[in-house]
Amino acid sequence: MKIAIVCYPTFGGSGVVATELGLALADHGHEVHFITYKQPVRLDLLSKKIHFHEVTIPDYPLFKYQPYELALSSKLVDMVKLHNIDIMHVHYAIPHAYAGYMAKQMLAEAGIQIPMVTTLHGTDITLVGNHPFYKPAVTFSINNSDCVTSVSQSLKDDTLRLFDIKNTIDVVPNFIDTKRFENQYTDCQRSIMALPHERIITHVSNLRPVKRVQDVIHIFDTVQKEIPSKLLIVGEGPQKEPAELLAESLGIAHKVVFLGNSNEVDKILCFSDLFLLPSEKESFGLAALEAMASGVPIISSNTGGLPEVNIEGQSGFLSPVGNIKEMAANAITILKDDATLDGFKANARKSSKRFDTKTIVPKYEALYEKVLFKSQAP
């Protein structure tokens, strides 16, 4: 199949999953065309099976805000015609599903019928999409997609609760190549980050308010008083400076390392002992899954799709949002001795196998075949 993938090209979960899906589909022999405003951060190499088409937006003084969705829909039309694309897969409802629908209509007028799969990722539904300004367009786009998927049962439930959805929503969870995270680094550079007797605690996110990064600092502050440890924070975002200031005020700035964005999170997770994700909301928790595949147990909130990923008492622990005291106590339980930590590490890695690329990507391929067959039926 020839598949057009529309996504955000950033470090956020939706862009990462869309890119990894495209790479996996190319490995399966499909021809994949990424269509977005810049090359996705996880897309390192292009090939005969992997293509990138940049969406450019002419700058007209008449427009206060440049119309990206119009430029995207026009680019989709051009690429479908030029490359004989079979199916469009748009990730994140706003504005991609709406732009995809417009492209479908323009192509239909040219006698080209192409199905569109829409994948819902989280904040496109629970935060942005539920705003009264966007809600009618999001509802329309979902209901007029040929196939709709959600990355968790929790997000599917939220979508059906918040919107008037007539379409069927299939749950296809996020995934990773678990082999990528399996001890391929012999020394892992652990000695650069911590002393031999110290535990390494890690947090990876876009450092937005929803991630509750200051909770991460508070949890670590409690833990480090009981267990010698270092905290690594990977990512960039608006909560970085407040987190830095909080660490300074608590007198633990020398134990907290801000590493910025990284395309090689696996090289950091390989020497981590615990992963903190106390988010206000997570539709799935891809960062937690990557940590689990590296054999890193999880301390997380019990919100959204996280309970579907982090299994209570096995891969880690779940706590109510904002319950810093309980999260810190659970972290200490895991880190207190090597035997307990090793048990949680083994269970975390085992649990991550449920979401391996080899298990999940065929589900997308089956959906593609289903909608293609339906679109080609007389």
Which residues does each PLM region occupy?
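N-terminal strand-loop element at the rim of the active site
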Residues: 5-11, 23-68
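Conserved donor-binding/catalytic core segment of Leloir-type glycosyltransferases
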Residues: 194-211, 217-220
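Carbohydrate-associated surface elements
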Residues: 154, 175
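Aromatic "clamp/platform" in nucleotide-sugar-dependent glycosyltransferases that forms part
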Residues: 261, 280
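A short helix/loop element that forms part of the nucleotide-sugar donor recognition site in Leloir-type
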Residues: 182-195
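Conserved acidic donor-binding segment of nucleotide-sugar-dependent glycosyltransferases
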Residues: 312-313, 317-324, 333-338
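Short hydrophobic beta-strand element within catalytic cores of glycosyltransferases
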Residues: 297-300, 310
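A short, well-ordered alpha-helix in the C-terminal region of glycosyltransferases
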Residues: 326, 333, 340-354, 363-366
